[in-house]
């Protein structure tokens, strides 16, 4: 039976704004308080989805969250009607309103960790929603994330869903942004690579000094257990604390993997050779052969990697066995990075082509092509069991672009978040979206 990897891209929500909420994310902090353009952001994301679909890749879409999150504001003591809750939050504690309006759920690489059926003990695709407990504005996402994923992958015969891990620092889990799967073929058993930034309970592990390590070893181990993964198909690697302190807040900012290829920066990991040896050994036993493509710091610095998001790219397998690298246009604007990419293609290695996309609205908030997608490897039977409403087609693309044009503003400042009309606009848009994507009731305002 044939299998493929499906990229489910996050649809940017109507409240996309530059709140500067993500300490440790250089782009997020440096663009704080600028005016954003939610309409442009959503259309840029949809254009990437359409382009990949046109290239022959199976492409899906993942719905945004309800924002402003009035229910979360009520939990924090704001009372009255929904409009009064927003007005009080704006007057008494504007940072909380900004956090409750974040459109960060567009970066669905953090939505969950996914293990395909070829790796799991019960032969089902397993999903664990990420608790994202390091940042308040993201920690409130996982209940809706779980409902949306449940509506997309509803058939319990093929799909298993786990709630987020306990929302405490010891089990900080950032989802697929710190998880890569290596395999000879998507339908065969592979090796799942979990990258962590620190250990919560074992002081022998190093930790960053400036910025937080968002993923713990304990969280990664818990997800592997929940998914029924054997020790033979799991490798744990530690991210270099020094690069976390340079703004590499997730592993997908310094490395990307697909198939048998790991594309990574020389400074990405601790104990790199030992880690690569374990990956090679376990992948070999699964029938694959690891190809490690290391980018030397002498050619691309960590600073250039963070500025350009070279590694926050999509590495996609083409039918002829070669690979395509999807990068943001910031890579083209960086002479060191673009020079390296030209040499990479010329070297006749696994990466045969680079395609550039304009994702400026997302990039300015700290998220590139890889942040915007959740990868799910599916066989033909499983793909047929996915809610068809979330699989991108030419008609769906047209419907969604028209939906964005109808409902999204072209300018969003901090003051706009306090506009009581914004709540009505967003709920109207999302209510229509759940009908377009055939999700049913997934948002708090639809459930209450």
Curated annotation (Swiss-Prot):
It catalyses: N(2)-succinyl-L-arginine + 2 H2O + 2 H(+) = N(2)-succinyl-L-ornithine + 2 NH4(+) + CO2. Signal peptide: none annotated. Its EC number is 3.5.3.23. The active site is at residues 174, 250, 371. GO terms for biological process: arginine catabolic process to glutamate; arginine catabolic process to succinate. Homodimer. Catalyzes the hydrolysis of N(2)-succinylarginine into N(2)-succinylornithine, ammonia and CO(2). This is N-succinylarginine dihydrolase. It comes from Pseudomonas syringae pv. tomato (strain ATCC BAA-871 / DC3000). The gene is astB.
């Amino acid at each position: 039976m044939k299998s493929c990897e499906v990229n489910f891209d996050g649809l940017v929500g109507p409240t996309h704004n530059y709140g500067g909420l993500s300490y440790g994310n250089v782009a997020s902090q440096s663009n704080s308080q600028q005016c954003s353009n939610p309409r442009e952001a959503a259309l840029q994301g949809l254009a990437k989805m359409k382009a990949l679909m046109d290239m022959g890749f199976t492409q899906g879409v993942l719905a945004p969250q309800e924002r402003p999150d009035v229910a979360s504001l009520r939990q924090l003591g704001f009372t009255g009607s929904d409009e009064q809750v927003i007005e009080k939050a704006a007057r008494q504690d504007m940072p909380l309103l900004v956090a409750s309006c974040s459109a960060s759920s567009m970066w669905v690489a953090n939505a969950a960790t996914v293990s395909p059926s070829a790796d799991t003990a019960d032969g089902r695709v397993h999903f664990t929603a990420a608790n994202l407990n390091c940042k308040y504005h993201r920690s409130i996402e996982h209940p809706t994330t779980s409902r949306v994923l449940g509506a997309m992958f509803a058939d319990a015969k093929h799909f298993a869903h786990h709630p987020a891990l306990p929302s405490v620092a010891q089990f900080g889990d950032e989802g697929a942004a710190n998880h890569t799967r290596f395999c000879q073929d998507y339908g065969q058993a592979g090796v799942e690579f979990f990258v962590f930034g620190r250990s919560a309970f074992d002081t022998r592990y190093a930790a960053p000094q400036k910025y937080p390590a968002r993923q713990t070893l304990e969280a990664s181990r818990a997800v592997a257990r929940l998914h029924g993964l054997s020790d033979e198909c799991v490798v744990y690697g530690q991210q270099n604390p020094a690069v976390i302190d340079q703004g590499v807040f997730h592993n997908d900012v310094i490395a990307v993997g697909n198939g048998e290829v790991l594309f990574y920066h020389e400074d990405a990991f601790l104990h790199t050779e030992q880690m690569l040896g374990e990956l090679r050994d376990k992948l070999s036993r699964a029938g694959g052969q690891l190809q490690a493509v290391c980018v030397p710091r002498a050619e691309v610095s960590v600073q250039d990697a963070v500025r350009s998001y070279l590694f926050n790219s999509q590495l996609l397998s083409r039918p002829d066995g070669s690979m395509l690298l999807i990068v943001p246009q910031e890579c083209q604007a960086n002479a060191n990075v673009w020079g390296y990419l030209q040499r990479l293609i010329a070297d006749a290695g696994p990466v045969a082509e680079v395609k550039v996309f304009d994702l400026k609205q997302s990039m300015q908030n700290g998220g590139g092509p890889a942040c915007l997608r959740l990868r799910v490897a599916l066989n033909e039977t499983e793909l047929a069991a996915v809610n068809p409403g979330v699989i991108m087609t030419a008609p769906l693309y047209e419907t969604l672009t028209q939906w964005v044009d109808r409902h999204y503003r072209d300018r969003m400042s901090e003051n706009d978040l306090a506009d009581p009309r914004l709540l009505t606009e967003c709920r109207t848009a999302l209510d229509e979206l759940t009908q377009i994507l055939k999700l049913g009731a997934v948002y708090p305002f639809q459930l209450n």
